[in-house]
Amino acid sequence: MATLEQMLDVGVHFGHQARKWNPKMAPYIFGERKGIHILDILQTAILLDKARVYARRQAASNGSFLFVGTKNQAASIVRFAAERCQKNDRSQAHYVNHRWLGGMLTNWPTMQLCIKRLLELESNHERGGFQQFPKKEAAVARKQLARLEKHLGGVKNMTGLPTTVVIVGQPQEMNAVRECEKLGIPMITMLDSDCNPLLTDIGIPSNDDSIASIELVMREITKGIEEGQWIQKEGREEATIEIEWFVVEPTPVEKPLVIIEPPPVEKPVLSK
């Protein structure tokens, strides 16, 4: 588990400018410094541990994960996280790091047809089949393969809906969030100060604009998945144990954060 010092070193606690915040994040904000919100790193540590334990339990139960992060800071990290988990089971971790296609989950049967086409083109290309096509048809096939690989390459091994979706950059991934909500798919989300904690199942207050911060959070979640994969592979009893967390989850406050200054202390008047 990452230490508080490690979290501070990578800037997990830095939020956005105070004027850009979401008031629903007030319970997770420690304070404000130079116009920047500072996230409560103690809650970050507690909720990150909760996410890791949840990921371990889901992986141990043969659950599957979909990592979603399409903004520049997150794209390569979510891909690496998913591919790291695929080393043990290619069907257990997937990613979307370019653009979320509408209906990716809610219209899954159609997506399956697109994935089937992608796999057919890949197989044909590997066998040198494109060389047998007329020049124009080969160019069209290569273009279609590149486009499908770009959008669906991270989910081509996904055989069904994921049991958990990991979100990095909630404001940018609202289409994915809405589809998960509609289908009742649990979400683990990095919550920066401009996010909505009510739109996730496990929220981790953290800086989702820093590459180092995203790497730390994703590393902890992937560790949990790998631990669960090992438990599932070994058939250990821990795979069926229900784990309880001691987590303080404050009720979201709708009012903006107000810092009340203590009244000045009057000096006593000494009588002569």
Swiss-Prot record:
Which InterPro entries is this protein grouped with?
A: Ribosomal_uS2, Ribosomal_uS2_bac/mit/plastid, Ribosomal_uS2_CS, Ribosomal_uS2_flav_dom_sf
User: Can you provide one Gene Ontology molecular function annotated for this UniProt record?
Assistant: structural constituent of ribosome
Sorted alphabetically, the Gene Ontology cellular component annotations on this record are: chloroplast; mitochondrial small ribosomal subunit
Keyword annotations for this protein, in alphabetical order, are: Chloroplast, Plastid, Ribonucleoprotein, Ribosomal protein
Subcellular location per the Swiss-Prot or TrEMBL entry = Plastid, Chloroplast
Q: Which GO terms describe its biological process?
A: translation
Q: The organism sits in which domain of life?
A: Eukaryota
Under Gene3D superfamilies, the record lists: Glucose-6-phosphate isomerase like protein, domain 1, Helix hairpin bin
Q: Which family does it belong to?
A: Belongs to the universal ribosomal protein uS2 family.
Instruction: Specify the protein name.
Output: Small ribosomal subunit protein uS2c
Q: In which organism is this protein found?
A: Nephroselmis olivacea (Green alga)
